[in-house]
Amino acid sequence: MALRIGVLCGGRSAEREVSLRSGEAVYQALMAAGYNDVVKIDVGYDLVEQLKGNEIQVAFLALHGKYGEDGTIQGLLEMLDIPYTGSGVLASALAINKIATKKIFKMEGIPTPAFSVITKKEVEDKSLQEAALRAIKEVGVPAVVKANTQGSTIGITFVHVKEKMAEAIESALKYDQDVLVEQFVAGTEVTASVLGNNSPEALPLIEITSVTGVYDYQSKYTPGMSDHIIPPRLPQDIQEKIKELAIKSFLSLGCRGLGRIDFIIRDNQPYALEVNTLPGMTATSLFPDAANYAGISFPELTDRLIKLALEQ
């Protein structure tokens, strides 16, 4: 196919190595799908020169974390008039902002765990202890304290007892001006992959379980401590409800192309946690795994994502 595709990967975020693996997998899949003119680009300060020099006609984003899924690279590509895979500037910026995402969930009537917002200014104007007491009053313990716009492994603390709340907030404030304190909901974790633009579809759900048999947030964020079960061990009507909420979440933020929405299910009630606009794209990642179960091979998936990018 006479279309020059640039696979953008690497970058400067803490998830650089994962992004490089995603980039290589996507490169191979696009070639297998029949795209013969594909260039891998390690994103750096010379990105504009690389895009222009290689005469890139469409960008496949295999980036993760800061500068990749926060709207930054999307804005640059918009200025250069280069179509790209995944969500646009606003949806990307909203999805990486955990607090903004939670507020949108609340406005749209999408169930989500209770939360409290702590700002650096509040801590400076009042005190760390006062902010911690407010979070405990509004959310309670156990809770998860998260830096607002960091990746899932950075600036996160699981708080079991009230006495540790202030310390967790202080730690998160090292990474961000705003902190999300979220109620911990024990239950089954399920991730929903969504594919499409204006009329997206939810792919088969994947249940994520702890290898130790005890589910908690730490299991979620520790590599090698979780297994993927597809389809999840949930009643069919609950699975359909999760898919509906996933599509609603996707559209509420204005996402397009692809996205992955994480849920916790307790007593058959799904709670939306967050939206990932650029999920991992190695052949064994969650999103391609869900697509594969739906009968969409990895090469076919990359082809569909390119076509969705060109629809915009």
Curated annotation (Swiss-Prot):
Main localization of the protein described in the UniProt heading: cytoplasm
Domain annotation ATP-grasp: ranges: 102-307
Domain of life of the source: Bacteria
Swiss-Prot/TrEMBL cofactor(s): Mg(2+); Mn(2+)
Entry GO MF terms: ATP binding; D-alanine-D-alanine ligase activity; metal ion binding
UniProt pathway: Cell wall biogenesis; peptidoglycan biosynthesis
SMART domains: GARS_A
Function: Cell wall formation.
Name by which UniProt lists this protein: D-alanine--D-alanine ligase
Organism the protein comes from: Desulforamulus reducens (strain ATCC BAA-1160 / DSM 100696 / MI-1) (Desulfotomaculum reducens)
Phylogenetic lineage: Bacteria, Bacillati, Bacillota, Clostridia, Eubacteriales
